[in-house]
Amino acid sequence: MAKAPVNVTVTGAAGQIGYALLFRIASGQLLGVDTPVRLRLLEIPQAIKAAEGTAMELDDCAFPLLAGVDIYDDPRKAFDGVNVALLVGARPRTKGMERRDLLEANGGIFGPQGAAINDGAADDVRVLVVGNPANTNALIAQAHAPDIPADRFTAMTRLDHNRALSQLAAKLNVSVSDIKKLTIWGNHSATQYPDIFHAEVNGRSAVEAVNDEEWLRDTFIPTVAKRGAAIIEARGASSAASAANAAIDHVYDWVNGTPEGDWTSVALPSDGSYGVPEGLVSSFPVVSRNGSWEIVQGLEINEFSRERIDASVRELEEEREAVRALGLIK
């Protein structure tokens, strides 16, 4: 019997990431090649026309798995019955804008979207926040959705994870598929910590394979953490195709499971693991089993790692306090 279409809502659908994402979703790369999808594009009123143009192109691709495209400027309609929500649209930081202003502007987007998801989404809804500051935007959305299990709200650190894989593979002259068990900890920001202490390269310790703490400290970690800024500098625009690719990877693994013997990185509400305060949306090593993320337990955290994880967690705590002071969460 044919599967019923899965409702996938993409916010900021007319933007660059949305454009890089929608065609891949419609082709079956998000959920699998046997799962039809119905796309819902959510945009602000002034971008509806652009979204209509994208919908026309989606039609023109004649994707067999695409059951339809709907366009909305009302979150309540866009999230009604949604199974997968990709929250891409966010208020970007502009010149001279204070971080507090950025958090407040995004609170005005992600609070109402969280409430709309709470009221209308399907029982199995999964939410991925891509729009920055992603961790705290996910925290705000989740705080407005008290009826949905907290771990259904995630923020994307898969792009950082993929960037770290690529840098490590280049250093060791191996394929990215030869590397397992790499981790991004903390915030999707310059304080994030890409951790190779548990990673393996063809079954061997990655740290032993690299054998160069100076490279790890002074090249690898800052290159991964500041890669987004380097791309803006080179391209004149932020990462779009690579961000869309990471979103596809994140949801695909969430729905279909992570490969045996490996894990990935996801920011999700902490359960207190590894000393990260409960409820804080922080990146962890995770596996996906039966459609749910589980934090990998029992990893030894050395002093080098502890210091860096704690620094990123402190930043997340500061962001949480800032949005609490603004009345965006309780």
Curated annotation (Swiss-Prot):
Binding sites annotated in the UniProt record for substrate: R93, R99, N132, R163
UniProt GO molecular function: L-malate dehydrogenase (NAD+) activity
Keywords: NAD, Oxidoreductase, Tricarboxylic acid cycle
E.C. numbers: 1.1.1.37
Catalysis performed (reactions): (S)-malate + NAD(+) = oxaloacetate + NADH + H(+)
Disulfide bridge partners, by residue number: none
Listed NCBIfam families: MalateDH-SF1 (TIGR01759), PRK05442.1 (NF003916)
Protein's job: Catalyzes the reversible oxidation of malate to oxaloacetate.
Name of the protein in question: Malate dehydrogenase
Source species: Thermobifida fusca (strain YX)
Lineage of origin: Bacteria, Bacillati, Actinomycetota, Actinomycetes, Streptosporangiales
